[in-house]
């Protein structure tokens, strides 16, 4: 397995350069790889590497910070539009005959959500967060942003606010922050309680940013009207993940 520490160490123990993506490079692995001189992460996020340990050993860690800016932001909006229009559901049920058997000319199982005039709160306002904000603004949305670093370009796209304000005022919350030890399970029972009733959640950053049981509970109770996620805490997704039930 690509996450099995002994196998990773065995594969890397005689190498000078490790090129990885989802493979965790832990202290245990680094201790077992005395020849390692460079770690290249084929992703923007580099949370799979114990960077503190790598630094102690003098091993540089490289990532690819801008390879997916356009595609990831586009997909975030695609996930949001799916929540608003349930396109997949209506395609599937129309093919199953639901529209053909409908008494009215208009077949729709869910009300549509119009985004113009609504507020999107973007947590993490780097390249991808800002690109997502530009698309949201083009759809007529108001953009709020929360980020440890502010920029003039960010201010042209949206308004920087503290996290509590963003949670309280946003109709849609989209996550675009890196995963750190400080923000693991950022979206949990307490932060969800601060959100608007019926808020929508989008996450194509890192699955560990969510407490998945708390998000599932919020979806089942109706506190969250929907969540569109293409990342989970363990990938491939486990069959017992609460978000699947």
What is each model feature region?
Residues 1-62, 168, 188:
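An N-terminal-biased, well-structured beta-alpha scaffold segment characteristic
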Residues 21, 42, 79, 176-179, ...:
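Short, well-ordered coil/turn residues at beta-beta hairpins
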Residues 26-30, 142-144, 148-242:
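Rossmann-like adenosine-cofactor binding region
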Residues 36, 116-119, 189, 198:
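Phosphate-coordination loops involved in phosphoryl transfer and adenosine-cofactor binding
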Residues 57, 65-119:
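Phosphate-binding beta-alpha-beta segment of Rossmann-like dinucleotide-binding domains, i.e.
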Residues 119, 133, 141-142:
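Residues at the starts of beta-strands that form the adenosine-phosphate
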Residues 125-126:
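Glycine-rich Rossmann-fold phosphate-binding loop(s) that bind the pyrophosphate
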Residues 129-130:
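N-terminal Rossmann-fold NAD(P) dinucleotide-binding loop
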């Amino acid at each position: 397995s690509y996450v099995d520490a002994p196998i990773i160490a065995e594969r890397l123990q005689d190498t000078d350069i490790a090129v990885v993506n989802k493979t965790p490079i832990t202290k245990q692995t680094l201790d077992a790889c005395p020849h390692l001189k460079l770690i290249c992460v084929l992703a923007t996020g580099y949370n799979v590497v114990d960077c503190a340990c790598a630094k102690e050993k003098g091993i540089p860690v490289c990532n690819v910070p801008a390879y997916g800016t356009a595609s990831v932001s586009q997909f975030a909006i695609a996930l949001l539009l799916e929540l608003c229009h349930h396109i997949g559901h209506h395609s599937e049920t129309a093919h199953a005959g639901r529209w053909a058997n409908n008494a009215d000319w208009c077949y729709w199982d869910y009300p549509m959500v119009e985004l113009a005039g609504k507020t999107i709160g973007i947590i993490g306002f780097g390249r991808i967060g800002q690109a997502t904000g530009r698309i949201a603004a083009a759809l007529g949305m108001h953009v709020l942003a929360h980020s440890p670093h502010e920029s003039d370009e960010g201010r042209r796209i949206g308004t920087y606010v503290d996290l509590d304000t963003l949670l309280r005022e946003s109709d849609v919350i989209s996550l675009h922050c890196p995963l750190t030890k400080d923000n693991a399970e950022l979206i949990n029972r307490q932060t969800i309680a601060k959100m608007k009733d019926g808020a929508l959640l989008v996450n194509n950053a890192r699955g560990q940013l969510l407490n998945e049981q708390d998000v599932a509970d919020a979806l089942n109770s109706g506190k969250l009207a929907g969540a569109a996620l293409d990342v989970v805490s363990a990938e491939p997704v486990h069959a017992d993940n609460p978000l699947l039930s």
